[in-house]
C-alpha cells in the first residue's frame, strides 16, 4: 500500500500551466494572424492546439478558430467556457471574467494545405530574387 502512495505522490500531473500546446490569446499584444500562424505551427508539432482567452480576447480566439476552420486547416475537438475570479488591482476584490478554451485538431487536408502554402511562399521568394 505504501508503494501506491509513493507512486501517487511522485506523479507528474499535466496542469494547465504545463500544457505545451496551449496558446493564451490576448487582443492587445499580438496581431490576429500571429495567432493563426502560431496555431498552425502548434498543430504541425502536436497534432492539436488549445486556444485560451479571457474577457475581451474571447472574440479573437473565436476569429482565429473560424479562420483555421474555414480555410480547411482545423476541426473543432472541444469548446469549454467558464468564469474565473481575477483580483482587481485597483479595488483588491475579485472580479469574474469569462474564459473560453477551444481545442482544434488537424484536418485531413492539413499537411496538404501546409505543403501548398510553403510552395507558394518559395515561388514568391524566387520571383523576388529574379
From Swiss-Prot:
GO BP annotation list: rRNA processing
Q: Name one GO molecular function term.
A: mRNA binding
InterPro entries, per this entry? Alba-like_dom_sf, DNA/RNA-bd_Alba-like, UCP030333_Alba
Report whether Membrane shows up as a keyword of the record: no
Q: Name one GO cellular component term.
A: nucleus
Highest taxon of the lineage: Eukaryota
What residues bear N-acetylmethionine in this entry?
A: 1
The record's keywords, sorted A to Z, are: Acetylation
How this chain assembles, per its entry, is: Homotetramer.
Protein name (Swiss-Prot/TrEMBL): Uncharacterized protein At2g34160
Q: What is the originating organism of this protein?
A: Arabidopsis thaliana
What phylogenetic lineage does the species belong to? Answer: Eukaryota, Viridiplantae, Streptophyta, Embryophyta, Tracheophyta
Amino acid at each position: 500500500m505504501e508503494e501506491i502512495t509513493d507512486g501517487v505522490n511522485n506523479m507528474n500531473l499535466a496542469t494547465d500551466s504545463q500544457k505545451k500546446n496551449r496558446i493564451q490569446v490576448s487582443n492587445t499584444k499580438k496581431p490576429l494572424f500571429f495567432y493563426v500562424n502560431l496555431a498552425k505551427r502548434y498543430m504541425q508539432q502536436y497534432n492539436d492546439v488549445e486556444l485560451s482567452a479571457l474577457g475581451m480576447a474571447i472574440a479573437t480566439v473565436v476569429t482565429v478558430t473560424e479562420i483555421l476552420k474555414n480555410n480547411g486547416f482545423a476541426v473543432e475537438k472541444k469548446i469549454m467556457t467558464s468564469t474565473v475570479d481575477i483580483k482587481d488591482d485597483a479595488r483588491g476584490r475579485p472580479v469574474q471574467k469569462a474564459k473560453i478554451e477551444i481545442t482544434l485538431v488537424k484536418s485531413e487536408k492539413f499537411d496538404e494545405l501546409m505543403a501548398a502554402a510553403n510552395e507558394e511562399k518559395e515561388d514568391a521568394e524566387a520571383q523576388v530574387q529574379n
